[in-house]
């Protein structure tokens, strides 16, 4: 393949795709990623996963503070690229950038467009109980994930799959569908299909507060919520012990309690036959296998109950109206 490609991407998902493209000898002439960010607990700047891959392979690297910067745009033009590939870059590209490559800009979107347009298609589809996801390659336009579709691949969502696991599955097949698209571009056989705007839904970025588990919903829905926000932004609930001020409890691993039925009012603390912590929902309950009290390390729920006996434990949450 003779197409010259400039690759835009930032997180681990994009790094996996870039690594696979390089493995298949795609001609990556330059890489664009976001500027290094400081660690949460220190001022040390951390490179993006995509930057790490680019440096490992000795690829030309651009890290503009703004994608609209005139100098950056001139540097992009100098690469004389045939195609820009964009995978979770993390910033909006204006039309002046989209117009640079000979054959246009193509985005790998981790969702089945036109559903789940936006920053969090992986998390949102699991939270809403979807049983299938996939990758959609679109030719980018000025809208948010509104471009014409080039190719789609599909991935089933298992009943216990988390958003992290789905991201890994989608990333592992991302290069394949991009290579197919590049081959079609080079051969002149690419066929684009317009999105049906009537079927479009939005998947905005998740806030940390959206990680709170809705215990007042049926267990299946609450479990889908937990899976969707795992590992990020993270599932959590508030608990109080011996009537003290509530603390945040992060839920790292969970599962549906096998025995269906009612376990009391939503939020009721249940101790399973295996001496694990479970929480009642409006129907059924969810077993918590690994938890983390704010400010402490992760532990299994048996150890948690040793420190916080169930009789003095209360789950605090806001009802969803």
From Swiss-Prot:
GO molecular function: methionyl-tRNA formyltransferase activity
Binding of (6S)-5,6,7,8-tetrahydrofolate, residues: 111-114
Superkingdom of this protein's organism: Bacteria
Keywords of this entry: Protein biosynthesis, Transferase
Database matches in SUPFAM superfamilies: FMT C-terminal domain-like, Formyltransferase
One Pfam family this sequence matches: Formyl_trans_N
InterPro entries reported for this sequence: Fmt (IPR005794), Formyl_trans_C (IPR005793), Formyl_transf_N (IPR002376), Formyl_transf_N_sf (IPR036477), Formyl_transferase-like_C_sf (IPR011034), GART_AS (IPR001555), Met-tRNA-FMT_C (IPR044135), Met-tRNA-FMT_N (IPR041711)
Disulfide bond positions: none
GO cellular component: cytosol
EC number: 2.1.2.9
Catalysed reactions, as listed in the record: L-methionyl-tRNA(fMet) + (6R)-10-formyltetrahydrofolate = N-formyl-L-methionyl-tRNA(fMet) + (6S)-5,6,7,8-tetrahydrofolate + H(+)
Family: Belongs to the Fmt family.
NCBIfam families xref list: fmt
Biological function: Attaches a formyl group to the free amino group of methionyl-tRNA(fMet). The formyl group appears to play a dual role in the initiator identity of N-formylmethionyl-tRNA by promoting its recognition by IF2 and preventing the misappropriation of this tRNA by the elongation apparatus.
PANTHER family: METHIONYL-TRNA FORMYLTRANSFERASE, METHIONYL-TRNA FORMYLTRANSFERASE, MITOCHONDRIAL
Protein's name in the database: Methionyl-tRNA formyltransferase
Lineage of source species: Bacteria, Pseudomonadati, Chlamydiota, Chlamydiia, Chlamydiales
